[in-house]
A protein has these predicted regions:
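Polar, low-complexity loop segments and adjacent catalytic/binding residues used for recognizing
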Residues: 1-191
Length: 191
């Protein structure tokens, strides 16, 4: 979605609204670059209102979105102590009136998150994002062992149908390659 060049953004969208109530998305991705200390910014997976797929400041998509954003943040913008290291994965649900706070790396609006060392791996990395019976779960396979490690699980998450899936990435003064190799969406049978 971006090359290892400053001030870029890119995105990919499925423009058909989703009618599934319960779903799981598998992301096959690679984030890598030449810098060893300073790099950024990251990428996002989206499940949003179809009108919310325009370029903007939140990992390449617009702010004040309506729906779900799962952020794969590689750069700590927070000046001062943090309760977590980067790279960091977090989830945010917004009704269109909340902004993602880059200065605090979204920590005040996140549902949950985890540190995940997915950058500059010798192999591709995977993430699974599932929404089943109003439970949002994000898991990763960072070590390429074929085993999911839970990053976050949040109950009582309410997402409507007829939103769209997408992904976007952004670089600022710092950069990285953000390669999205595939997104696969599955309907989950749930009684």
């Amino acid at each position: 979605m971006t090359s290892d060049t400053a001030s870029q953004s890119g995105s990919v969208w499925c423009t058909t609204p989703v009618t599934m109530r319960n779903w799981e998305a598998h992301l096959h991705f690679r984030v890598h670059g030449s810098a060893s200390n300073l790099f950024g910014d990251g990428f996002a997976f989206w499940y949003v209102d179809p009108s919310n797929r325009f370029a903007g400041p939140v990992f390449g998509n617009q702010d004040q979105f309506r729906g779900l954003g799962v952020f794969f943040d590689t750069y700590s913008n927070h000046n001062g102590p943090h309760s977590h290291d980067h790279p960091y994965i977090s989830a945010m649900v917004s009704n269109g009136s909340h902004s993602y706070d880059h200065d605090r790396d979204g920590t005040h609006s996140q549902l949950a998150g985890c540190t995940a060392k997915f950058r500059n791996r010798d192999h591709d990395t995977l993430a699974a994002i599932s929404y089943v019976d109003n439970v949002l779960t994000v898991s990763t396979d960072i070590d390429n062992k074929g085993m999911w490690q839970r990053c976050l699980r949040v109950t009582n998450v309410r997402l409507p149908t007829h939103f769209i899936f997408g992904a976007s990435a952004m670089t600022g003064d710092l950069s990285d390659n953000h390669d999205l190799l595939s997104i696969k969406i599955y309907e989950v049978d749930y009684p």
